[in-house]
Amino acid sequence: METSGGYAPGGKDTGLVKPKGSSSIRAHEGLDTVPMRGRKPEWLKVRSPGGSEYLRLKGLMRSRALHTVCEEAGCPNIGECWEAGTATFMILGDVCTRACKYCAVAHGLPTELDLEEPARVADTVRAMALEHVVITSVNRDELADGGAGIYAETISRIHKAVPGCSVEVLIPDLKGDESALRVVMEARPAILGHNLETVERLHPDVRPGGRYWRSISFLGAAKRIDASLLTKTGIILGMGEEAGEIRQAMSDLREAAVDILTLGQYLRPSMQHIPVARWVTPAEFAEWKRVGEEHFGFGHVEAGPLVRSSYHAKEQARAVEAGEPGSIQRVLEGDIPAPAEVLPGFDLVQLEIGRPGRLNPGAVRRAPHNLRLPRPDEPG
């Protein structure tokens, strides 16, 4: 397990916080974006958290020195989920080495690894009597394995402490390191998630530490390593993307054989983050769910204004496993092969990157498929 290479603490629980940079991006030039303090649509209004179960879980997390992405990322569903006794654990500290322009998690210099964290997480999962748990983390780019060893240890500890509890992980790209990915997968999570976050054009501006094709290839590599593993990703809408770009992202994700997709509305955490380009309506989300499942063959699409990566995660997993409409069984029968499955010798993870957010010409050949949707100006 990688244990060295961290930074001295200070400013946050596990590191030194730094500014994320400018909140303006090129994609918003000429757009009439949503004011920070503008009135939100009715469908985005949620009840403030504070029920008895919420307070119990908050006390439990504090007493065990654990972090949740529900709190750190300012998730709007925290009241609903915590009252239902579910939470998404965030490991590897609470300071991220990357400065994504949409994310509320603190950016800066993380501290040393907490080697006792996996045991505390497993003990808390047992105390909560969970049947399905989601584990995510900050990026730890200063670590040789990106934190993969701690992920694997956490998964293994949960399996031992709570036999029968399924473990879903939402991992960073681990800098595209397939050996680190294998470390996580060898611990046998039930679902492996990695979020694409946005369309290719917006990546350089809003996700400067990530790469569109690195994320696509990372998800495809997981399927190449273990085709039976369910894979999952999420895209945030309302940051300036266009309909054709969403369809293209869906197409690219299905080429990587991704099973589950989540789609949710971007909510601006602060003035230091990029503005909301527009509010996506519930009807639009419902249509994207239909498009994703019926046209592109995703095993399940969870789409809605308040949907986040781990929202209704247990229900998503059970629905796909049970073979409900849009299920993985149907997907596997007529699946679109990932590039790694059809191109001999294709190294899906280690892509050659050109300028930020763009793939060098010739660095990868695209796999053929027959599920591309028509452009917006073409008849459906």
Q: Model-flagged regions — what are they?
A:
Residues 1-88, 123, 153-164, 185-187, ...:
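Auxiliary Fe-S-binding modules of radical SAM enzymes
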Residues 34-44, 80-117:
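Canonical Radical SAM [4Fe-4S] cluster-binding loop centered on the CxxxCxxC motif
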Residues 71, 91-92, 136, 170, ...:
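A secondary-structure boundary/capping signal
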Residues 76, 97, 200:
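Nucleotide phosphate-binding site architecture
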Residues 93, 168, 324-326:
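Short, intrinsically disordered/low-complexity patches at protein termini
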Residues 94, 172-175, 240:
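Short, surface-exposed acidic/glycine-rich loop or hinge patches that mediate macromolecular interfaces
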Residues 99, 143, 202, 271, ...:
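Glycine/Thr-rich phosphate-binding loops of Rossmann-like dinucleotide-binding domains
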Residues 104-120, 125-220, 232-233, 260-262:
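Core AdoMet radical
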